Amino acid sequence: MKLQLHLALSLLAAIVAANPIRLDQRQITGNELRDGSCHDVTFIFARGSTELGYLGSTVGPATCNVLKLRKPGQVACQGVAPAYIADLASNFLPQGTNQIAINEAKSLFELAASKCPNTKIVAGGYSQGAAVMHAAISTLSSTVQDQIKGVVLFGDTRNKQDGGRIPNFPTDKTKIICAFGDLVCEGTLVITAAHLSYIDDVPDAADFLVGKL
């Protein structure tokens, strides 16, 4: 088991090293719910393992930017951080992430609902961030869940384990995007090139979320 964990972590680290983060993306923080005023739409996102910043470096900031373009002046973007550190080892825990990350995500949904009762919440997660969303959203109160209009999950590490859905949450509000050949969607933690391809799916994901507003 220790050897398997070491090999998996080594593979993940090698892929991260081969996929450098752009400086402009790294500087995006996405702390607008906590630090800003209420907006018509609040986008809450959990980044993938090893990604930096509040929104991460790939699909998180890209989805935020597309939403802001399609709903000018109406969208606040909030990443699940800093308590959620997006470490590699937490992928191997029973829920695919750790309880600290889950609690932080839950608290952000609850903050959006209490601070901005009229905002429409949309959400997303990538890789381990998708696992964060599965666990957090499934345990929210029905009142807060009702305020969530749509969720998009990229490269969902809990896709197979949870039957292609977020437990206790409407399937028509959920879009799980799994690229052909992405083995994490099949219940493994084997990282292939397909797991790094989701930037191409951002427009479709944003269309889904906008369509739910």
Curated annotation (Swiss-Prot):
Enzyme active site: 127, 182, 195
Domain of life: Eukaryota
A GO term, aspect molecular function: cutinase activity
InterPro entries (UniProt xref): AB_hydrolase_fold, Cutinase/axe, CUTINASE_1, CUTINASE_2, Cutinase_monf
GO cellular component, one term: extracellular region
This enzyme's EC code(s): 3.1.1.74
Assigned keywords, A-Z: Disulfide bond, Hydrolase, Secreted, Serine esterase, Signal
GO biological processes: carbohydrate catabolic process
Family: Belongs to the cutinase family.
Protein name as annotated: Cutinase 1
Upper lineage: Eukaryota, Fungi, Dikarya, Ascomycota, Pezizomycotina
Gene that encodes it: cut1
